Regions:
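Compositionally biased terminal segments of proteins
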Residues: 1-157
Length: 157
């Protein structure tokens, strides 16, 4: 995935004042742990006003009326993830309100980092480790182990 496309989305999120945190493979890459990925994973504060700002940001990058199908309550519901597939692109954008009962937007620790002139709200290595260490997916467990080694992370008591 081209970093320029990711930064276009994050620049729009910054411009629209969206409360978000970048997680997933791209966040790992920005922490120096390269992993191939074809999605942009964004934890988004699930309040309706913030979801509307996220939609406005997406509309400013993608000329796609399907963005309007994202409802303000989607990220606060029983299945709090929306997968948006931009037309004519080879990646997807996952908007996440929470991960089950384990991790909510409010639980995330993040740092702000400038990447090619764009302010990025990036999950900390510890947050990424917490998100990935106990999942069933092998790739997530491998990511957790890489984070643990690289940043000297240990499980919390």
């Amino acid at each position: 995935m081209e970093l320029a496309k990711v930064l276009d989305v994050l620049r729009a999120f910054e411009r629209e004042a969206v409360d978000y945190v970048l997680v997933g493979g791209i966040a790992l890459a920005l922490h120096g742990l390269a992993r191939a990925t074809q999605d942009i994973d964004l934890f988004v504060a699930p309040d309706p006003g913030n979801v509307e700002r996220a939609k406005a940001a997406l509309r400013s990058v993608f000329d796609d009326t399907s963005i309007d199908d994202i409802a303000p309550g989607d990220l606060a519901g029983e299945y709090p993830t929306v997968r948006y597939v931009p037309e004519e692109e080879s990646f997807v954008i996952d908007l996440i309100g929470r991960l089950g009962d384990a991790i909510r937007y409010e639980d995330l620790e993040f740092e702000e980092r400038e990447v090619e002139g764009v302010r990025v709200r990036l999950a900390t290595p510890r947050t990424l480790y917490r998100m990935k260490k106990g999942t069933a997916r092998l790739i997530d467990r491998a990511d957790a182990e890489a984070l643990r080694r690289r940043f000297g992370l240990e499980d919390e008591p």
